[in-house]
A protein has these predicted regions:
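A short, conserved alpha-helix in the catalytic core of glycosyltransferases
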Residues: 152-154, 158-162, 169-198
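Glycine-rich, basic loop-to-helix element that forms the pyrophosphate-binding segment
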Residues: 59-76
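Short beta-strand-to-loop acidic/aromatic patch adjacent to the donor-nucleotide binding site
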Residues: 81-92
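Conserved donor NDP-sugar-binding/catalytic core segment of glycosyltransferases
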Residues: 91-126
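A recurrent flexible, glycine/aromatic-enriched loop bordering the glycosyltransferase active site
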Residues: 120, 135-154
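A conserved acidic beta->alpha catalytic loop
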Residues: 20, 41-51
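Active-site donor/metal-binding and catalytic loop motifs
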Residues: 193-213
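Short, acidic, metal-binding catalytic loop of nucleotide-sugar glycosyltransferases
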Residues: 28-37
Length: 268
């Protein structure tokens, strides 16, 4: 690892392929917490137009979602960030989103951390139905066996142990590679957590759905996902994962700072 000094804790990577307006829409949500995170756009399509002096990498070919995410992970950890996060561009984030993911009250063994959201994985699904900008953070987190890659943060320690997404096994769209990464991170002894202090809205299947058609995209992505997971882990394990429930745990209250009376040296 190259230990170049950085001032932020996390590098956020957005894999982008067309639909610049989606990426532009989520930029303010990310940049609102620029005291905590830096932002990298991986331009898979070669046509991204920067609007906020954002850092853009143009690999010259379409790396796919998994490949672009892995490029972001490698870049982050070679530069010395503690965490790296991949974020879909068809998303919007609640206020304080990254503060929630980086909350030091989460267990020390965290290897993967993600938000709760309005998408379909029950392990991360929230009952909240309002505007993402009005979400009120809850002091709970969930211990889970797998996490969705829509917005997924990995620690440097976990990445050094297991690496990133498998770019070969899960087909063109990489569905299921997030489950596989979750399994490998958990097997290496790290915790997987979804925090209710962070909420994400996901439009879902936008860029890929438009490029190949939503029905065809869903069929191919789901087929490749199921085949790969069953081959790697077996039907029984995959079935158990689908039925798994989260363990909901309260976050400890922040500890009050100690006030020191400098005239006497006493604390109170």
């Amino acid at each position: 690892m190259v230990n170049k000094k950085v001032n932020k804790k996390c590098l956020v990577t957005i894999p982008a392929y067309g639909r610049n307006e989606l990426t532009h829409a989520v930029l303010p949500d990310v940049l609102a917490e620029s005291d905590l995170v830096d932002l990298l756009i991986v331009d898979n399509g070669g046509h991204y137009e920067a609007v906020a002096d954002e850092w853009v990498e143009r690999p010259g070919r379409n790396l796919g979602w998994a490949g672009a995410s892995n490029l972001g992970f490698r870049t982050a950890f070679h530069r010395g960030y503690e965490y790296a996060l991949t974020l879909n561009n068809d998303t919007r984030l609640s206020p304080g989103f990254f503060a929630g993911l980086l909350d030091t009250r989460l267990p020390d063994d965290r290897g993967l951390v993600a938000p709760v959201y309005d998408d379909w994985w029950a392990l991360q699904a929230s009952t909240y139905k309002g505007a993402v900008s009005d979400y009120e953070p809850l002091d709970y987190y969930r211990r889970v066996p797998m996490l969705d890659g829509t917005a997924l943060m990995i620690s440097a320690d976990a990445w050094e142990k297991v690496g990133g997404f498998d770019e070969r096994t899960f087909g063109r769209f990489s569905w299921g590679s997030d489950i596989d990464l979750s399994m490998r991170v958990a097997a290496a002894g790290f915790g997987l957590y979804a925090t209710e202090r962070s909420f994400l809205h996901h439009a879902g299947m936008v860029s890929a759905g438009e490029s190949v058609g939503k029905r065809r995209y869903f069929y191919r992505a789901h087929r490749d996902c199921e085949r790969a997971l069953r081959r790697l882990y077996g039907r029984a394990t995959v079935r158990a994962l689908r039925k798994a429930l989260p363990e909901r745990i309260p976050l400890e209250a922040p500890q009050p700072s100690v006030q020191v009376d400098h005239s006497t040296g006493a604390s109170g």
